[in-house]
Amino acid sequence: MKTGWLNQGGSWYYLTDSGSMKTGWQKVNGTWYYLNGSGAMQTGWLNQSGTWYYLNNSGSMQTGWLSQSGTWYYLTDSGSMKTGWYQVNTKWYYSYSSGALAVSTTVEGYTVNANGEWI
């Protein structure tokens, strides 16, 4: 009986020790993956109940800073995309409702530099 990861028709599926297919959020060897309703592993942006997540090309959930096409996004330790004002270590940042980091501009009267840091 096949268990673990299975590549079928170009999609990846995860099978339990009993051979049943998993769906939803699954933590495999310390890494989070999202398997859709048919069990296929998802990649790219995922909107779940109004919260955005990013799953990289290997399907693992991204955390921390993410750059896509010259735009930066910040994903929390739980994988959710940040918007509005937030603090990372000792610095403050602002991301628009799209999740895109504000850079070299003024937001709500506060200036952010080219790195998106409030100055």
Indicate residue ranges for each PLM-predicted region:
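Extracellular adhesion/carbohydrate-binding repeat motifs centered on closely spaced tryptophans
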Residues: 1-119
